[in-house]
Amino acid sequence: MSGGMVLVDVSGKASTVMTTKGDIVTFSSSRVRKAVGSNSQFLVCDSTDADGNKYDYNTTSFVIACSDETSDLEVGDDKAQIQLPFQFELTAISANVNVASTGADINIQVQEDNVNIMSGVGITIDATETSSLTSATLPTITDSTLASGSIISVDLDQIGSGDTGKGLKINLIGYRIV
């Protein structure tokens, strides 16, 4: 001990494990190198991983209310708009209503700066159902990287022919790109 400090010789320990900028040393039954994660990932504890931690994305979502909860839905463009506060990687998209349509499906298209971000009809909520998660046709995202400051708008392209549906919400799921 020298001046209140404990000196420990660790020469050759961590440097033999780490090979790349950003590497960390972790432990399972021995010291192991955990390679640096990808951009936008962060380190989390995970008891199912051999060394107890892994890199993952911090998932977040935007929920866009496209109507009130009690009025019938109506076909039209720009039913709701938001401006993204940061660059966003879209990994999933879904929609739900609190009152199901009858007679026809609900079809919804989402746009980034007036350009569709999904192929085909976009999101479908099947007639008599309240969620797109159970739809026979799931949406295919064609533009997953959404720019900071872009305007996200929702178009309602088809509604039920009996009950039109009520209380439409869109869920944009993904992570912030840093």
What function would you assign to each model-found segment?
Residues 1-178:
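Extracellular repetitive beta-rich solenoid segments
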